[in-house]
Design a protein with these regions (language model features):
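Aromatic-rich peripheral "rim/lid" segments of glycoside hydrolase catalytic domains that contact
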Residues: 361-409
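N-terminal export signals
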Residues: 6-26
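Ser/Thr-rich, Proline-interspersed low-complexity disordered segments
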Residues: 21, 25-81
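Active-site mouth of glycoside hydrolases
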Residues: 83-293, 298-299, 311, 325, ...
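Hydrophobic, well-ordered secondary-structure elements that form the walls
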Residues: 358
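Active-site clefts of carbohydrate-active enzymes
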Residues: 236-240, 308-343, 363-370
Length: 409
């Protein structure tokens, strides 16, 4: 079990004495792990809904360290208006409405391994984020692989409390990414726990998750260059595997820990299955806005938008959508013109319904043998979702995005 003293020693070794001192100050005040203890900071009303899941949360082991003070690490103290905020069902930034114009990002040659040891290439990322910004984007979504953040590789691990402290080099690469994004005026959606083993959802393992969060969140807390904490990508799979009675309380606890460490920053989760709206009542007071992913025919989007808007008064962001322009099978049997028409239809639907924005999948095409976790060794539609081809030339869909996003010259 990780004791208070051992936690401070580890932090001092890995991150230096100043950060360890901040941890020691915070460890003097214990806090509750009750998943219902901290309400969301948005003031929107929850709609009436049914089919809620019964929370079966159990208490968290008491030996878990209390989080360090959320002191900003990389930037001066920002003004409140420097953060993206929520009013009603829209986002605001510096006093004005801020429609999310975003893209999901993996490097062209290192998909699913952005920050892995030996694969992080900041100059390439700068070049690629410039391409996204040239479309009129104001937001980029990136992914922190849970295993890679500990070991530098995608190797699946089941660590103890010592082993769940994120690697210093990996965190430095994330910090560099945020700096690069800021130079392109891109807010960052910071997606946590990608690729995490199912066993970590169990209540008895939550002290490990807390230890992880107590290290990674303070490094980027109070940083207005972030748009939000995305608690996990598509946890629908976890619900199917370990059950909603485990997964929903897990995210309630995660939200509370992050809210304590970084109270200003927005929080969300991206769902792919429309059935997950049944859990909105259980998470509505924890999350500041909702996200959904859409890979269906564009003609089916209007009904889905109406469904989501009927379930919450908070912003509902289309966080993934796209169309592959190659690869075997029916999912790859689309032309680049089909892709452009699909985007046009999707963006038109969002505008007509006064939605808060969208984040397309994805910026670049990928070479065969790299995309996926584990990588797909033969050609697949996953390699062909990009708005930019392998040589960085634009597909016709780029013109569609610019027509809606209207980038400044």
């Amino acid at each position: 079990m990780l004791t208070r003293r051992r936690f401070i020693q580890l932090i001092a070794t890995l991150f230096g004495s100043a950060f360890a001192t901040a941890c020691a100050r915070a460890l003097a005040v214990p806090t509750a792990a009750d998943p219902t203890a901290i309400p969301s900071r948005t003031a929107t009303a929850s709609p009436t809904a049914t089919a809620t899941v019964t929370s079966t949360a159990t208490s968290t082991p008491t030996a878990t360290p209390v989080p360090p003070s959320p002191t900003p690490t990389f930037t001066p103290t920002p003004r409140p208006t420097d953060f993206v905020s929520v009013r009603g069902d829209q986002f605001y930034y510096r006093g004005a409405r801020f429609p999310i114009n975003g893209f999901n990002y993996y490097p062209r040659l290192h998909p699913w391994r952005t920050f892995n040891f030996g694969e992080w290439e900041p100059a390439v990322t700068e070049q690629e984020l410039k391409l996204g910004a040239s479309l009129g984007a104001n937001t980029v979504r990136m992914f922190v692989d849970f295993n890679a953040s500990l070991t530098g590789t995608l190797t699946n691990t089941l660590p103890d409390a010592v082993g769940v402290i994120p690697n210093r080099q990996y965190l430095a690469s994330i910090a560099e990414f945020i700096e690069i994004a800021a130079r392109q005026n891109l807010k960052v959606q910071f997606t946590l726990f990608d690729g995490m083993d199912w066993s970590f959802y169990a209540p008895e393992k939550f002290y490990l998750v807390q230890t992880y969060l107590y290290t990674i969140i303070p490094m980027f807390a109070n940083d207005a260059r972030l748009m939000c904490w995305d608690l996990q990508n598509e946890p629908d799979r976890a619900i199917r595997t370990v059950g909603a009675n485990i997964v929903i309380p897990f995210f309630q606890r995660v939200s509370n820990v992050i809210r304590q460490l970084d109270p200003r920053q927005l929080q969300t989760i991206g769902w792919i299955d429309r059935a997950r709206t049944q859990y909105f009542p259980d998470l509505d007071k924890y999350l500041d806005f909702w996200c959904f992913h859409f890979y269906d025919q564009a003609a089916n989007l209007p009904d889905l938008v109406k469904l989501y808007k009927s379930k919450t008064t908070k912003p509902v962001l289309l966080q993934e959508y796209g169309l592959a322009t190659g690869g075997p099978g029916p999912d790859g049997a689309n032309t680049e013109q089909d892709q452009a028409a699909h985007y046009d239809s999707v963006l038109k639907t969002l505008d007509e319904n006064k939605m808060c924005g969208s984040v397309f999948w994805c910026l670049n095409d990928f070479p065969v043998g790299l995309a996926g976790n584990p990588p797909l060794q033969t050609d697949h539609p996953e390699n062909h979702f990009g708005v930019f081809r392998l040589d960085y030339s634009e597909k016709p869909v780029a013109r569609v995005l610019r027509s809606y996003w209207k980038p400044s010259s």
